[in-house]
Curated annotation (Swiss-Prot):
Keyword hit for Cytoplasm: yes
GO terms classed as biological process: translation
Membrane-crossing segments per the record: none
Protein name: Large ribosomal subunit protein uL16
Pfam families (UniProt xref): Ribosomal_L16
Recorded name of the encoding gene: RPL10
General function of this protein: Component of the ribosome, a large ribonucleoprotein complex responsible for the synthesis of proteins in the cell. The small ribosomal subunit (SSU) binds messenger RNAs (mRNAs) and translates the encoded message by selecting cognate aminoacyl-transfer RNA (tRNA) molecules. The large subunit (LSU) contains the ribosomal catalytic site termed the peptidyl transferase center (PTC), which catalyzes the formation of peptide bonds, thereby polymerizing the amino acids delivered by tRNAs into a polypeptide chain.
Length: 220
């Protein structure tokens, strides 16, 4: 039987139905890669962060997430190179979609009249997103802003409903604003930790803090 159109599962009507010991034989999600581009780039290399934000309460199928990921990655890679950005899909398809299969193909001499609204068997996976939730994020250099915005704009057409593209005030994927990050970096209160930063703790062993944050300006 062919895959049912995703418009049948667009809205969040029921409770979340994740995979569990009671819900078995669930097919794998189509999307398997959630981080793309130059993942090992330090925080200082990619200061600009751009988000694709959902404007509706809906369900996004794993096929749509995979299509959007491929679309954004292909465009940005072709225009500016694969090492010019770091793209991350921020939602995961944990909700199991169900289908009650009934014969309606050419081989059936009549349409099968089954129970309406029956429970059904696992059919696919979808991510449940709310209004204002981030679907995809990309960090890059300031000079590459227009290319990343265009890549996310093209990926937006793979999803139902409305989405908006937002340029974040934060420094990369960190929770710090740009001026706040520069001030803390100058003062030695943060150090690079992959795509994020590690903060100086005000508690704990003083020697360990001194070793980890040697540039911090301790006041007497």
């Amino acid at each position: 039987m062919a895959r049912r159109p995703a418009r049948c599962y667009r809205y969040c009507k029921n409770k979340p139905y994740p995979k569990s010991r009671y819900n078995r034989a669930v097919p794998d999600a189509k999307i398997r890669i959630y981080d793309l581009g130059r993942k090992k780039a330090t925080v200082d290399e990619f200061p600009l962060c751009i988000h694709l934000v959902s404007n509706e309460l809906e369900q996004l199928s794993s096929e749509a997430l995979e299509a959007a990921r491929i679309c954004a990655n292909k465009y940005i890679t072709k225009v500016s190179g694969r090492d010019s950005f770091h793209l991350r899909v921020r939602v995961h398809p944990f909700h199991v979609l169900r289908i009650n299969k009934m014969l309606s193909c050419a081989g059936a001499d009549r349409l099968q009249q089954g129970m309406r609204g029956a429970w059904g068997k696992p059919h696919g996976l979808a991510a449940r997103v709310s209004i204002g939730q981030i679907i995809m994020s990309a960090r890059t250099k300031d000079s590459n802003k227009d290319v990343v915005i265009e890549g996310l704009r093209r990926a937006r057409y793979k999803f139902p409903g409305q989405q908006k593209i937002i340029i974040s005030k934060k420094w990369g994927f960190t929770p710090l604003n740009r001026d706040e990050y520069i001030a803390k970096k100058t003062n030695g209160e943060v150090i690079d930790d992959g795509a994020y930063v590690k903060f100086l703790s005000r508690k704990g062993n003083l020697e360990a803090n001194l070793q980890q944050f040697p540039n911090y300006q301790y006041s007497a």
